[in-house]
């Protein structure tokens, strides 16, 4: 129940996973991993297919896990605003090659990242 409370799902403890919303199901998947008490949590596209509200809640959950539990999270994500809002260090790849690596403010200013992911010209 502690993990469900952390996830904000305690009120849905009796709901079958198949009846949860997409966002709640993704949070439950994180909860399953948390049950193993990992030192590092690997997430692949943790906000994929989510509404803006679900995306914000998922990002807040990730930040909470880092801040309150000291959990390290390594994640892949195409929503650059989510990345810039959460990550302390970012590695950006394009076509299998690293095009930038650094702190969020450095990566955001990188001209290759701007051209490829942020829609600005070189």
Task: Report residues per predicted region.
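Glycine-rich phosphate-binding loops of nucleotide-dependent enzymes
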Residues: 1-122
